């Protein structure tokens, strides 16, 4: 199998691993996906396509801080549904990086019945580490298209 196809399959599997981690509410599995230098900018709303308004909710990847944040979410919310669909995967000619465009429709409900709906399209950027492992290095917040 050619290197680019292997990379495409590895990135597809990374998306599926992330989906399974959200489904299982497994914070350890989620943080295992991230590169140590990962960043995750968020638009204030799914309609804010202009990056000049974007923010960082959790800062640069910090395993402990991100784990605690997701554990708090899982402790206070019930996952109603988590639907994800890969729209496109692009791999570099060198097969050392790529991105996946993923449509997300995830609904959480807290103990008071308040919903938190994650809905939109994300660009998830991956890099192949020197040991061959793939890591998520950048992820945009969800945008409506």
What are these language model-derived features?
Residues 1-37, 113:
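Short, low-complexity N-terminal intrinsically disordered segments enriched in polar/charged residues
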Residues 27, 31-94:
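A solvent-exposed, acidic/Ser-Thr-rich amphipathic alpha-helical stretch
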Residues 34-35, 42, 104-106, 140-143:
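Short beta-strand segments enriched in hydrophobic/aromatic residues
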Residues 49, 107-109, 145:
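Short, solvent-exposed loop/turn segments at secondary-structure junctions
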Residues 84-90, 104-106, 121-127, 141:
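Hydrophobic/aromatic beta-strand elements that line small-molecule binding cavities or substrate pockets
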Residues 92-94, 111, 129-132:
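Flexible loop/coil segments at beta-strand boundaries within sensory signal-transduction domains
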Residues 99, 117-145:
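Short beta-strand edge/turn micro-motifs at domain boundaries
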Residues 107-117:
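Short, cysteine-centered beta-strand-loop-beta hairpins and adjacent loop/turn segments enriched
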């Amino acid at each position: 199998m050619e290197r680019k196809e292997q990379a495409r399959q590895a990135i597809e599997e990374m998306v599926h691993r992330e989906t399974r981690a959200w489904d299982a509410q497994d914070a350890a599995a989620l943080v295992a996906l991230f590169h140590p230098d990962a960043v995750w900018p968020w638009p204030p709303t799914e309609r804010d396509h202009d990056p000049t308004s974007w923010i960082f909710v959790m800062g640069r990847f910090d395993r402990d801080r991100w784990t605690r944040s997701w554990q708090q979410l899982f402790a206070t919310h019930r996952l109603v549904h988590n639907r994800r669909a890969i729209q496109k995967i692009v791999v570099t000619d060198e097969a050392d990086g790529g991105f996946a465009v993923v449509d997300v429709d995830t609904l959480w409900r807290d103990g008071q019945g308040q919903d938190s709906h994650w809905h939109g399209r994300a660009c998830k950027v991956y890099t192949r580490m020197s040991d061959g492992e793939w890591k998520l290095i950048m992820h945009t917040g969800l945008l409506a298209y």
